[in-house]
Amino acid sequence: MAVFRPFIRFPLEIRARVWELTLEQRTVDVGYVTQWEHSSGRVRLHVVSSTPLPAVLQSCREARNQGLYQQAFREGRSPRYLWVNFKVDVISIGHTDFDYLEPERLLIRRIIFERENDETFLYLTRLDLEKFDRLEEIQVVCVDGLLMWQEAWEMVDWPCPKEMVKFIDKETGQEASGWDIDKMWENIVGPPPEDSEPEGSE
């Protein structure tokens, strides 16, 4: 008959591996609020999130000491921060400005943001996005629908492999790649004109 050994009796390297296997990809909501600080006479940013603390960090001290998560998105002396594993977690920022994420810019691997493809995005916001050159995956929640993002798909220097860029229609939930959006656009306006034949050809 098999005998269950108390977890604490397993060798440390086995216990560490078990804690590592508890890692699951989470979508971590990241937003900021401003607060007036009377002591300094300044307005300070504080991170806010609806994402709960990772369950493993609430289990025991040994789990917390494994370094599976790190404190992130802390602004200056603010006591507020989030626990994140940047290798697996997806950072969801909604309409939050990319500038606020500058301290974590080189750590973030996966991001979701919500925008309209307007002039502000095309000529300003996209420049901030392009600085996040360690990204491996981007999801864009399209407030104005998928078709409106065809121009951005062509113009933006996406800082991750283009096959890892996904667009999501906010209203319908439909998902599409940039190439899918190209096809949708062609179905409406027709294919791009072919190159004209050189002079003298028949």
PLM features: residue spans?
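Structural motif
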Residues: 9, 100-103, 127-130
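Structured loop/turn residues at beta-strand edges in well-structured enzyme cores
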Residues: 86, 106, 133
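Internal catalytic-core helix/loop-beta-alpha segment
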Residues: 87-95, 99, 110-120
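Eukaryotic C-terminal
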Residues: 1, 109-202
